[in-house]
Amino acid sequence: MSESFKKSTVREYFESIVIAVILALFIRTFVVQAFKIPTGSMEENLLIGDHLLVNKFVFGPTAARLERAVLPVGTIRRGDVIVFKYPEEPSRDFIKRVIGLPGETLELRDKKVSINGQPLDESYVHFLEPPGTSSEFREVTSYDVRERYGPVTVPPNQYFVMGDNRDNSQDSRYWGFLPRDYIKGRALVIYWSYDDGLGDYHEESTGEALKGLGSVFVHFFTRTRWDRMLHQIR
């Protein structure tokens, strides 16, 4: 085998690796993101330990009419389950459902949402049972925003988002409207669901993270929620 052939082969391997890395980074940055459900704020639709794929391209900007016609992009609609940067701590990602759109007037009375004076049909909503069960995210306010909020008008280029588990969700009722620029993408599908038994979100040390990986290795088949695999998110 000639020296030039060896160099050519090594170069081809190197170029293939570089291209693969660039492609993976492009997909991760602009197209798809993996996301794990850390809390119960979206129950019963999304459970702690659900691993999702998030379509980041669907809300991406498009410059031309032809691109809008050909590429799978879209506008943000009421009912979309979205992943976004938490406005009060942008390094963290949250997941909620879009309820109020720009320009709409939203009001919450007795836990029922109205948009522009019309009751909203929300079959996906879940409430804590029995009544009076404590909520991790409940805050002390002049009135309980879980029961009553507004009316408020959603500003331009902002959205009002809420968790499906209305009594246990830190959402727009507590921290306000969500700017359009903070939205990263639409939740697409559950590719894996694992019940680690840890409950709601908590900070992990390096040791706990390694212990968690070991637990997944041991309990993968028994704790994986097989019936939730490839479940489309609505």
Where are these regions (language model features)?
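Soluble "head" domains of membrane/secretory-pathway proteins
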Residues: 2-11, 26, 30-36, 41-234
